[in-house]
Amino acid sequence: RQEKVSLIVKEVVKDLRPSLELKISTDEEEAFTDADFIMAQMRVGGLKMRVKDEQISLKHGCIGQETCGAGGMAYGMRTIGPMVHLIDVCEKYASKTYWIVNYSNPAAIVAKATQTLRPNARILNICDMPVEVEARMAEILDTDLSNLEVDYFGLNHYGWFTKVQCNGEDVTEKLKKHV
């Protein structure tokens, strides 16, 4: 799988940032030595386990989605160990000012676990869900996304928009009524 993905990444880097040095390796020391930024998007267990997580959860009347409920918890438990290992490898080999940019789900569970188990880790846990919701709000309000200013608290599917303004006007209640 790594070889297939690396072919695509090589083309993207060549087109967008030809001066960027791209290393592809399965050797931890070679891959992480002096790295400044490490991008992580883990799917521990692959899509087969995602299907199982969701089906087992639904069978028992629970939410099966990969970030919330029983399905998300199972996925999170599988992901914590490899993420902690990645942090340890980065601590050992990467530059002293490294940053891990983690895009792995379930973001909230993985973020809390890494914060607890490796409190000094240099890791940013991110998700595009809030951005997608914000884009939908702009559609509902028939405005450009650049006209919105939002207050958001949380991470991924465990977050809340506490205030939404459109061109300076508070439209939070208007959006609530739409929902």
Where are the model-predicted features located?
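Short, surface-exposed basic-aromatic patches at helix termini and helix-loop junctions that form
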Residues: 10-14, 92, 112-123, 138-145
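Conserved acidic residues
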Residues: 35-36, 98
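Conserved N-terminal Rossmann-fold NAD(P) cofactor-binding segment
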Residues: 1-34, 41, 48-50
